[in-house]
Amino acid sequence: VGPGVTDLKVGDRVAYVGPLGGYAAERVFNADRAVKLPDNISYEQAAGMMLKGMTVQYLLNRTFKVGKGTIVLVHAAAGGVGLIACQWANHLGATVIGTVGSKDKADLAKKNGAHHTILYRDEDFVAKVKEITSGKLCDVVYDGIGKDTFPASLDCLRPLGYFVSFGSASGQIAAFNINLLQAKGSLFATRPTLNHYAAKREDLVSMSNDLFKVVGSGAVKIPTNHSYALKDAARSHADLEGRKTTGSVILVP
């Protein structure tokens, strides 16, 4: 611990999110990016949840305030972010619809809080959303897919709904005419990132504490379904790219 650091000491259990360089057994980084881990959060949970869980925290609580009665569409609902988002949104009282790529992933998403699932490879997800909501459509779409789900995601939104693009697993969304948002119902569209939401120390701590609270209470469980040795990092990436994983993937030194 460097000179001038007053809120951390040698032996404290800490976690962080943001600074690159995590594929290592030891590293050096600024103390203001570290947060203390509560005793009821394991290292494995922390590794599997800090980036994904903090992302879900701001998506559901700040980008769009999800609450009782909100109708939410989560793309890739069986992925690392998706499983946390489904649980947390359900906990907040929302109706959760998730798109998935297989029946096994549909079952997994439902076990983790999704009320309805859509097999996007076999079904028209826009038509299914209209059917599930009896034409009311969704208040917000959380999209980490990108190119493959746009602009169809806009057709899942009610007038004045929110399209939240937080990732681009299938590629970047192409440039589009902003008037499309007006034509689809005076929609809002945003491309948020965790770095901006957690840029201030007080926000980082507040967001972390919110995450620790829902995980510590059991309201949200962190599915670390895939653990790899640090030396096998390349294989973990290949499995991710091959869509062979669900939930969080962690590397163990």
How does the language model describe each region?
Residues R201-P253:
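C-terminal hydrophobic helical "lid"/dimerization subdomain
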Residues V1-P19:
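A glycine-/small-residue-rich N-terminal strand-loop-strand element
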Residues A76-A77, I145:
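NAD(P)H cofactor-binding loop motif with strongest signal on the N-terminal glycine-rich segment
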Residues N90-A152, K200-E202:
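Adenosine-nucleotide cofactor-binding segment
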Residues V81:
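Hydrophobic/small residue at the entry helix of a nucleotide-binding pocket
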Residues R13-A76:
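NAD(P)H dinucleotide-binding glycine-rich loop of Rossmann-like/cofactor-binding domains
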Residues V100-K103, D148-A219, P253:
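Glycine-rich phosphate-binding loop and adjacent beta-alpha segment
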